[in-house]
Amino acid sequence: MNIIQGNLVGTGLKIGIVVGRFNEFITSKLLSGAEDTLLRHGVESNDIDVAWVPGAFEIPFAAKKMAETKKYDAVITLGTVIRGATTHYDYVCNEAAKGIAQAGTATGVPVIFGIVTTETIEQAIERAGTKAGNKGADCAVSAIEMANLNRSFE
């Protein structure tokens, strides 16, 4: 049996990151976690490009455009959606998740889902580097692994 898996060495990888500006006090921490993790795994600073978009709903569009350029080994998406009093949360979360999945399958470039979806601001803050780790850092590790896995299929 052959086992195919990506390693966690970022040397030589080019990574795109799409970040939603809405709830920027949280998404900026997710971005910092992602950038720090990429650098610690060997990705060069000049091989990381960041595109800011208005919010989570716009992330799939930019992620797909970024992936379509074929300049990136992986694209990380970072955003935060916090439930409010209306159904807006459900629509944004569902459509963003679908769009991000489609961006990866349509382009053949790994697109990593890093949208934090929570019931409260406190839960979002926890996932941006306090009690529950940093989702941006987790996504960076996934991006490196998937980029290297994808290369093994070429």
Swiss-Prot record:
GO biological process terms on file: riboflavin biosynthetic process
Swiss-Prot/TrEMBL catalytic activity: (2S)-2-hydroxy-3-oxobutyl phosphate + 5-amino-6-(D-ribitylamino)uracil = 6,7-dimethyl-8-(1-D-ribityl)lumazine + phosphate + 2 H2O + H(+)
Active site, UniProt feature: 88
Entry keyword set: Riboflavin biosynthesis, Transferase
One matching Pfam family: DMRL_synthase
Top-level taxon of origin: Bacteria
Pathway, per record: Cofactor biosynthesis; riboflavin biosynthesis; riboflavin from 2-hydroxy-3-oxobutyl phosphate and 5-amino-6-(D-ribitylamino)uracil: step 1/2
GO molecular function, one term: 6,7-dimethyl-8-ribityllumazine synthase activity
Gene Ontology CC terms, in alphabetical order: cytosol; riboflavin synthase complex
EC number: 2.5.1.78
Residue positions binding (2S)-2-hydroxy-3-oxobutyl phosphate: 85-86, 127
Entry binding sites for 5-amino-6-(D-ribitylamino)uracil: 22, 56-58, 80-82, 113
InterPro entries (UniProt xref): LS, LS/RS, LS/RS_sf
Subunit comment: Forms an icosahedral capsid composed of 60 subunits, arranged as a dodecamer of pentamers.
Purpose: Catalyzes the formation of 6,7-dimethyl-8-ribityllumazine by condensation of 5-amino-6-(D-ribitylamino)uracil with 3,4-dihydroxy-2-butanone 4-phosphate. This is the penultimate step in the biosynthesis of riboflavin.
Family stated for the protein in its record: Belongs to the DMRL synthase family.
Name used for this protein in its record: 6,7-dimethyl-8-ribityllumazine synthase
Native organism: Bacillus velezensis (strain DSM 23117 / BGSC 10A6 / LMG 26770 / FZB42) (Bacillus amyloliquefaciens subsp. plantarum)
Gene: ribH
